Structure formats: C-alpha cells, structure tokens
Amino acid sequence: MTIQGSDRKGTLLLLVMSNLLFCQNVHPLPICHSGNCQMTLQELFDRVIMLSHYVYMMSADMFIEFEKRYAQDHEFIAKAINDCPTSSLATPEDKEEAQQVPPEVLLNLILSLVHSWNGPLFQLVTEVDGIHEASDAIISRAKEIGEQNKRLLEGIEKILGQAYPEAKGNEVYSVWSQFPSLQGIDEESRDLALYNKIRCLRRDSHKVDNYLKLLRCRIVHNNNC
C-alpha cells in the first residue's frame, strides 16, 4: 500500500471514529473527579492522552467537514494557507527532534500550545456560529473542542505539577495578531481565514497528542515502549 493510500485510509478511520464518539455523546472521563486528584502519574498521562486524542479527532473531523463545504478548489487552498500564529513557538518538527528536548521543557511547550488556543477557540465558536450556511456538525464540534481544550489544559498542568513542580510557570504564549476578528469582511476572506484557523487547530492538536504520547513513554515507561 502506498503512503498516500495509507494516509487516506487513516483519515477516513479518524472521521468514522470521531463521528461515532460524538454522535453517541461519548466524552473522555474527567481528569479529576470533583477536583480530587489522587492519581498516579501514569493514570494522569493515560487520561490526558485520551482527551488529547479526542480533541485531535474532533479537530480533524471539523477540518474535513469545512474543507468539503468551502474549499473544493486548489486555488482557494493555496490562498488560504498561511503560517499559524503558534509557529512562533519553537516546537520540535519530528519525533527524533522531540526526543532531544528535556521532558520538562517539552511539557511546558505543550502547555503553551494548548493555552494559546483558549481565546482563539472562543472566537472560533462565535465566528462559525455566525455563518448562516455552516453545518450543525461544524458548529457542534467547534463548541465541543473549546470545552475539551480547557480540560486538556487542566490535565497538562497537573502532570507538570506532579512530575516537574519546579518547572511550572516557564511556558511562553504566542500572540494571535494574525487572526483578527472576522466581522465586517467579505465572505471569501472570512472563509479563507476560517479555513486557515481550523487547519492550524488540527496541526497543533496533532502535535500535542503526539508529544504527550512520547512523554508518557519517556517519563512513565523509561523509554521502554
């Protein structure tokens, strides 16, 4: 099987799984019950990774849905793609590079990525909800991702506090000057900006999910996985 064919099958499987979870109203377990967090580090990692993967699946699903409805031609996609604002964060490009980053530094980078999306996700929900022709699927997923991102942030903070308490407070947040409000702009510009924002969300949520899995292997399993 070619890599391209494998990628297509993986994307389709991701879409099916995301739809199944969302339609059945299946959500990841809370990070901590009633604020009481008597968990081992492995339990915290397992629960946070379940949540990060859910957020990534929802983001990928929303991107596929938006692309299907608004980005059918190559010219649109070429005009839409710009750098993501979080590109200012010096995140590793691949697994080998991530392995060279100290775990406490990588955890703070993950925390920075997730925290940097809090405000833009709230803005995204408002913008998508204001598009009359937007599908219920896109609107619902935007709202769900916004809620789950807050829980993901809480979980990563708990991991950092338990594993490396001395490293807390070292995160750096990106500035979102590239994603101004979409009010008052023409329809094409709005669609281009939304496409890029959702694309960046998918990219960053995938990074977070992969980094967390890598860190679980390094910290919990001592690289024996």
From Swiss-Prot:
Disulfide bonds join C32-C37, C84-C200, C217-C225. The keyword Secreted applies. Keywords: Disulfide bond, Hormone, Lactation, Phosphoprotein, Secreted, Signal. Residues 1-28 form the signal peptide. It is found in: Secreted. Its main location: secreted. The gene is PRL. Belongs to the somatotropin/prolactin family. It comes from Alexandromys montebelli. It holds the Pfam family Hormone_1. Interacts with PRLR. This is Prolactin. GO terms for molecular function: hormone activity; prolactin receptor binding. One of its GO terms (cellular component) is extracellular space. PANTHER family: PROLACTIN, SOMATOTROPIN,PROLACTIN. Prolactin acts primarily on the mammary gland by promoting lactation.
